[in-house]
């Protein structure tokens, strides 16, 4: 029956919205019993210095997963709790990379030193390659790999570590890297960061 003489009008039936799927908890991939494959891949194929790699391994920031033998780069919060992980395949015939499900983008793979400078990279291997090239007193400085396009890891580190006053944007030397660097620089300056400057590799990225 139509009310108030309203004829020819249609009314949409109400549907209760479906319950949003609950976010799965963050879980690190199971560790392999040894790290032979990631050491071979990162040192021989990608040219990372073995001693530099070992520092990160001993800090439990890099390990090899048991199922696929990926290199896993762990990101921790201010209390040292793992809450982000980036996986990189170690096969020389297939390329794979991606973040573990439910990783918190604010806490990607990073290293904290005591100086006032933070070096920012697109990927963990770029970060390790830069340190391999410039090893002198590297542990004094801070480094972060964005593991994506977000600037959240930088903003979180600046909040957690007020001693950081300078940010070097060591992104890829390509159109995307230059554009992202300009965007991030503007954001950081607006947030009160004292000094933000680009630091480009000689070639496209720090591992070439």
Describe every region a protein language model picked out.
Residues 2-4, 32-39, 49-50, 65-66, ...:
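Short, structured coil/loop segments at alpha-helix boundaries
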Residues 116, 132-208:
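TOPRIM fold recognition
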Residues 65-160:
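Phosphate-handling DNA/RNA-contact segment within nucleic-acid enzymes
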Residues 1-33, 37-44, 168, 182-208:
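Replication-associated primase and helicase/ATPase modules
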Residues 9, 13-103, 109:
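Basic, glycine-enriched DNA-binding surface that flanks or lies within the catalytic cores of DNA
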Residues 42-45, 86-90, 122, 126-129, ...:
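Residue-level signal for functionally critical sites in structured catalytic/ligand-binding pockets
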């Amino acid at each position: 029956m139509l009310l108030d003489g309203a004829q020819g009008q249609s009314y949409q039936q109400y549907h209760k919205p479906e319950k949003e799927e609950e976010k799965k908890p963050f879980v690190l991939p199971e560790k392999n019993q040894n790290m032979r494959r990631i050491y071979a891949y990162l040192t021989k194929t990608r040219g990372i210095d073995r001693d530099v790699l070992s520092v990160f391994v001993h800090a439990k920031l890099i390990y090899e997963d048991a199922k696929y033998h990926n290199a896993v780069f762990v990101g921790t919060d201010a209390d040292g709790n793992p809450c982000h992980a980036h996986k990189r395949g170690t096969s020389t015939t297939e390329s794979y990379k991606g973040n573990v499900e439910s990783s918190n983008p604010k806490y990607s793979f990073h290293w904290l030193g005591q100086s006032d400078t933070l070096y920012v990279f697109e990927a963990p291997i770029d970060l390790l390659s830069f340190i391999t090239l410039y090893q002198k007193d590297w542990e004094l400085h801070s480094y972060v790999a964005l593991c994506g396009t977000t600037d959240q890891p930088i903003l979180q580190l600046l909040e957690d570590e007020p001693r950081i006053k300078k940010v070097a944007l060591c992104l890829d030397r390509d159109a995307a890297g230059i554009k992202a660097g300009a965007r991030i620089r503007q954001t950081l300056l607006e947030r009160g960061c004292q000094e933000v400057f680009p630091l480009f590799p000689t070639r496209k990225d720090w591992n070439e």
